[in-house]
A protein has these predicted regions:
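Conserved redox-cofactor binding core of oxidoreductases
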Residues: 123-213, 225, 269-280, 288
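N-terminal Rossmann-like FAD-binding beta1-loop-alpha1 element of flavoenzymes
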Residues: 36-61
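Extreme N-terminal leader/targeting segments of oxidoreductases
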Residues: 1-36, 54, 634-635
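Glycine-rich loop(s) and the adjacent beta-strand/alpha-helix scaffold that form part
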Residues: 221-280, 435-455
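Long, amphipathic alpha-helical stalk/connector segments used for oligomerization, subunit docking
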Residues: 459-550
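Glycine-rich FAD pyrophosphate-binding loop
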Residues: 54-76
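Core beta-strand elements of the Rossmann-like FAD/NAD(P) dinucleotide-binding domain
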Residues: 32-34, 212-221, 417
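An anion/pyrophosphate-binding glycine-rich loop and adjacent beta-alpha core
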Residues: 249, 256-384, 455-459
């Protein structure tokens, strides 16, 4: 199989304009004839559903939450990037494009990233028009702050609740279309399979999480906006319900999964406090704008009160190692540096798994009131969880799984290799390479939903006149039968181990062998352990209740079953990519000073994996990465 990214043959800065000028259009009268299914109601899903419905399409939107407002986009804290250059500090579309390419360690598709930078400027205007209360300077102008991997201030924010405010704006547009009857919303409904007819995506199989009823829905195109798969690690900053099921079930129907091993470990999270935990809490990257990260220089000082350790005995390791960026070095680099300090025995807090994030200098320079205005809700959240006052004592933080750069493979149209299956936001792979810069996830989700898919979808739909199918087609009946059997198979195991015990064990395997540091030996061992654990899962799973009605045990079991297959694919991808790049750090490939050592000669490609059936090894298909505008170079933030 040869992958065609369908990139326009124009100069980089003209590609998107050229594409839009030549894109095929669906007339208003014909838009009413097309039905679309959108799975997911976060920023990508809600913005796509509202925009496409406004254009005249009939839209069905599905989410497993009880309301679209509870999509995980609501948890994003720090901000959203846009190349507005309001600070007059040298920012531009090109600089945002280059920072994103460089931040991803030259493992993302150039054309998609440039388009993202171009449309970023429209997002802020759209959200401002929806009433999103972005922070403002004293004079009333929109404010910006700095995020990792950038030397300009381009991040717009709404205190520490940016994701919440952006999602409420998108939800307002979605609600308007629901009220008009243009969007039919299906909350508490989980996608369990993708239905193909003649090789095209024509619908989905879903389970009503309240009644347990399994039904089928047909459409002319399917859009997956289902987020990332960080919960394969069990402990992550993701909401408990976040999962890989929708994208992985599409993968098992033939959609290629790209770069699954590219996962992001966020440097500023509240450390694990005990085995009882089921998730971790993010402390926004925006805190690194004013906070300074340090550990004691001497191991014997780690148990002391931080205020008693003199300045001369503190190691501000990011400022020392990366003077040009300091505490705003990219996430992958910052996380590895924190781990390195803790591995040396200089970590603080229980188990030595923590570093300090200190605001004493910022409070002295700006005053506590200013810090409260910028980060007050984050400081309150930290105190509620830890019982410590971060105005008086440094926060303790440690890296944790946060975001996934991998996802289903898509071309320039955001369409997967399955015709009619489009993938938006974190669910696709296209924009962030091997490491995402802070404040760029919200940017991608809204860019895809508001400003990309409304232009690209017509290129597919114009080929589908007269090809409508309904849910009575034999393909739907077969998929419905298979899904029902899969659910019943889980219930019929009747073993002794609860589902969470399998998930926790899988997460530990993934963290130990496919986390911040990876090796060929460790990944090989991880694959063997996952295969053994999966076999035990299918023979010893204990579920409470049946298939009818609300059964959260059954919901989790289906998701963990997918994680147990997907985790092996992640490890296989990490094993096959015999280099270090971004968040993928192979210990065999590092520079003398411990930085990631890329191998552009052999690995400058997208790893797209094809499912080959249960028990068979997936097939690797490569999409070469072609750089017209930038020349891949050694990534340096020093």
């Amino acid at each position: 199989m040869t992958l065609d990214p369908n990139i326009p043959a124009s100069p980089l800065d003209k590609k998107w304009t050229t594409y839009k000028n030549n894109a095929k259009l669906v007339s208003p009268a014909n838009k009413r004839k097309f039905e679309l299914i959108i799975v997911g109601s976060g920023l990508a899903g809600a913005s796509a559903a509202a925009t496409l419905a406004e254009q005249g399409y009939k839209v069905k939107c599905f989410c497993y939450q009880d309301s679209p407002r509870r999509a995980h986009s609501i948890a994003a804290q720090g901000g959203i990037n846009a190349a507005k250059n309001y600070q007059n500090d040298g920012d531009s579309v090109y600089r945002l494009f280059y920072d994103t390419i460089k931040g991803g360690d030259f493992r993302s598709r150039e054309a998609n990233v440039h388009r993202l930078a171009q449309v970023s400027v429209n997002i802020i205007d759209q959200k401002f028009a929806q009433g999103v209360p972005f922070a403002r300077e004293y004079g009333g102008l929109l404010d910006n702050r700095s995020f990792g991997g950038a030397q300009v201030s381009r991040t717009f924010y709404a205190r520490g609740q940016t994701g919440q405010q952006l999602l409420l704006g998108a939800y307002a547009g979605l609600s308007h279309q629901i009220a008009l009857g243009s969007v039919k919303m299906f909350p508490r409904t989980e996608m369990l399979d993708l239905v193909l007819v003649d090789g095209h995506a024509k619908g989905i199989i879903v389970r009503d999480l309240n009644t347990g009823e399994i039904t089928s829905h047909a459409a002319d195109a399917v859009l997956l906006c289902t987020g990332g798969y960080g919960n394969v690690f069990y402990l992550s900053t993701n909401a408990r319900g976040c999962n890989v099921t929708a994208t992985f079930r599409a993968h098992k129907r033939g959609a290629l999964f790209a770069n699954p091993c590219f996962t992001q470990i966020h440097p500023t999270c509240i450390p694990v406090s005990g085995d009882y935990q089921s998730k971790l809490t993010l402390m926004s990257e925006s805190l690194r704008t004013d906070g300074r990260i340090w550990v004691p220089k001497r191991k014997e000082d780690c148990g002391k009160e931080p205020s008693s350790i003199p300045e001369a005995d503190r190691d501000y390791f990011l400022e020392r190692k990366y003077p040009s960026y300091g505490n705003l070095a990219p996430r992958d680099i910052s996380s590895r540096s924190a781990k390195e300090a803790c591995d040396e025995g200089r970590g603080v807090g229980p188990g030595g798994l923590g570093v300090y994030l200190d605001f004493a200098d910022a409070i002295k320079r700006l005053g506590q009131k200013t810090i409260e205005e910028r980060y007050g809700n984050l400081f309150e959240m930290y105190q509620n969880i830890t019982g410590e006052n971060a105005y008086e004592r440094p926060m303790r933080i440690y890296p944790a799984v946060h975001y996934t750069m991998g996802g289903l493979w898509v071309d320039y149209n955001l369409m997967s290799n399955i015709p009619g299956l489009h993938v938006l936001g974190e669910a696709n792979f296209s924009d962030h390479g091997a490491n995402r810069l802070g404040a760029s996830a919200l940017m991608q989700g809204l860019a895809d939903g508001y400003f990309v898919i409304p232009y690209t979808l017509g290129n597919y739909l114009t080929t589908q006149f007269g090809k409508k199918v309904d849910a009575n087609h034999p393909a739907f009946e077969q998929a419905l039968k298979e899904t029902t059997a899969h659910v019943q198979r889980l219930i019929d195991i009747k073993g002794t181990r609860p589902v969470d015990s399998f998930h926790r064990e899988l997460g530990l395997i993934m963290w130990d062998y496919c986390g911040m540091a990876r090796s060929a030996e460790g990944l090989t061992e991880a694959i063997e352990k996952i295969q053994k654990l999966r076999k035990e899962f299918w023979s010893d799973l204990k579920l409470i209740g049946g298939a009818d009605g609300i059964n959260m045990d059954l919901e989790r079991a289906g998701r963990v079953a997918d994680f147990l297959e997907f985790g092996e694919l992640m490890c296989l991808d990490a094993l096959t990519r015999d280099e270090s790049c971004g968040g993928h750090f192979r210990t065999e490939h590092q520079t003398p000073d411990g930085e990631a050592l890329r191998n552009d000669e052999q690995y400058s490609f997208v790893s797209a994996w094809k499912y080959e059936g249960e028990g068979n090894t997936s097939t690797l298909i490569k999409e070469p990465l072609v750089y017209e505008q930038v020349k891949p170079s050694t990534r340096s933030y020093k």
